[in-house]
Amino acid sequence: MSDDVCINDRIKEIKENFNLKQSDIASITGYSVNSVKKWMMSETQQYYQKAPIQALKILDSWINTKASIDPVDNEDKKTADVLSFLNFKGGVGKTTIAFNISLMLSKTKKVLVIDCDPQGHLSSSLIKDPNDMEYSTSDLLMGRRGEPYSYSENLGVIGTDRTLSNTCESIPASDLLFLLKENIEKYKKQYDHIIIDSLPSKGPLYDAVLAASNKIIVPFTADLYDSWGLQDVFQQVKKIKLRKINENIKVAALIPNRVDKPLRNFDRTVLDSVQSSFPNEMCPDYISNSVRLKECKSPAVSMAITDYAPTDKVSDEYKKVLNFIINS
C-alpha cells in the first residue's frame, strides 16, 4: 500500500472515530472542503487526491489537544449513526445490500440491525431459527424490554415477524412517528452503527424510519421508472427536515445495483442522468448482477459476500460501496 493511501486511510479513520464532517476536517486543517472530499475517495476514483502529510499532522495535533482538555469526552459523546436502506420500489436489492453492509461493518465495529420491513427477509437471513428471536421490532416500538438477537459478538439483530403490521396499525400515526427514534436512543452508546431495513412503501412506519435516521441509503436499478422515483426520496427527506421532525437527516448515497456489465447503452444513459441530477450522492461504483449474492444471504449460508466469495468481482464492488457510504 502506498504512503498516500495510508495517510488518506488514517484521515478517514479519524473522521469516523470522532464523528467529523468533511467541513470539520477542512476547518481543522485549513484545507478546502473540495480537497477533503477528494481525500475521502477511493484510490481508483477519477478525482482521488493524495492527502498531504501536513494535514494528518494537524489532525493528530488536534486529537492530542482534545484529549488533554477532556480525555473522556469522546467516549461520553459516542453515539451511533443510523443508516436506513430504503426505496419506494421493491425488487431493487435493498435488503441484500443492507445484509452485506451490516456484516461487513461488524468485522471492526459494533452494529445493530433493525428490520422494519414486514416481509422480514433480512430477519430470515440473519436469524436462522425464528424461535431464537426473543425481541422483535414490534416489541421495540411498544417500548417493551428485551435483548437483540446476537448474531455475533459485534452484530445484534432486532428482527421482525407477522405482528409488525398489526402493531403499526394499532398505534396512532402521530405517536408512531417518533417511537422508533425514541426507543433506539438507548442503543446509540452500545453500538457504532444502527442499520435499518425499511419497508418499500410510504406510510406511518416509513415516516418513523426517516425520523430516526441520520443517513439514507437508496439502492436502485438502471430502470427509467426506478430512477424517476429517486426524486421522491429527496422530497420526503426535505419534508421531514422542513417540519423539524429530523434536521440531521440526509440522503447520503444512491447505490446502482444489479447492473449488467458491460453497460448497455440504455443503462448508461439512465445512470448518467442520475449522476447529473445527484452528483454528490451518486456512488461512482456499481454492484453487478451475481448469483453469489443470492447464495450468501440464504439462511443456510448467512455470510457477507466478501467472506463467501472473496475473489469474486462483486466483493470488490461491495468494498468500494461500503467505503463510499462510510465517507458520505
Residue ranges and their predicted role:
Residues M1-F18:
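A short, Lys/Arg-rich alpha-helix, primarily the initiator
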Residues S2-V5, N34, K38, T44-S328:
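P-loop NTP-binding core
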Residues D9, E13, S27, N34, ...:
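DNA-binding alpha-helical recognition surfaces that contact promoter or target DNA
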Residues I11, Q22, L271:
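Generic structural marker for isolated residues within well-ordered, non-membrane alpha-helices
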Residues E16, D24, K215:
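Surface-exposed, Lys/Arg-rich phosphate-binding patches that contact polyanionic backbones
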Residues S23-T29:
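Short alpha-helical "recognition helix" segments of helix-turn-helix
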